[in-house]
Amino acid sequence: MAQMYFYYSAMNAGKSTTLLQSSFNYQERGMNPAIFTAAIDDRYGVGKVSSRIGLHAEAHLFNKETNVFDAIKELHEAEKLHCVLIDECQFLTKEQVYQLTEVVDKLNIPALCYGLRTDFLGELFEGSKYLLSWADKLVELKTICHCGRKANMVIRTDEHGVAIADGDQVAIGGNELYVSVCRRHYKEALGK
């Protein structure tokens, strides 16, 4: 029986690395995984999942208009899929997360989703909210704050490295824009 997994964390915990390792494990056993990533994130090239340690793989793209069930079903009909791996899953819509439950329940294909739990304001992303609600298994990937405690928050910084507390929920960037911190240092950085 297939299940839907949500691997979540703050930034720099190795979500993409873990996804790529999972894909490799399936391939090593002669199985066919399909990788999807958000079209909005093209930092490392269009249609690619890349990790900070240098691993990368080609990926199918999704945006807010993508019918995830139909896209996966089409791939599955062309060549049997053994799992679906979704990077940057926080950018999924509620409807797309529901479509993933249909992939799991109707097509019997496991869905392994990797993404951020919350944004720089501490608010859930839409995709993360529904993955937390509907996933069969929740797995927290851990990273650390500069103080050594578990980092479970993300701060967005300006060009001078100062934490900012307003702006659009989505701003694509890496270490130059975001810092993973513990809750205490998150509150201190934002003056809360």
UniProtKB/Swiss-Prot annotation:
Record: residues binding Zn(2+): C145, C147, C182, H185
Main location group: cytoplasm
Enzyme Commission code: 2.7.1.21
One GO BP annotation of this record: DNA biosynthetic process
Localization terms from the record: Cytoplasm
GO cellular component, as recorded: cytosol
An example Gene Ontology molecular-function term: thymidine kinase activity
Reactions performed catalytically: thymidine + ATP = dTMP + ADP + H(+)
InterPro entries in the cross-refs: P-loop_NTPase, Thymidine_kinase, Thymidine_kinase_CS
Gene3D superfamilies recorded: 3.30.60.20, P-loop containing nucleotide triphosphate hydrolases
Assembly, per entry: Homotetramer.
PANTHER family linked to this entry: THYMIDINE KINASE, THYMIDINE KINASE, CYTOSOLIC
Family: Belongs to the thymidine kinase family.
Protein name: Thymidine kinase
Recorded name of the encoding gene: tdk
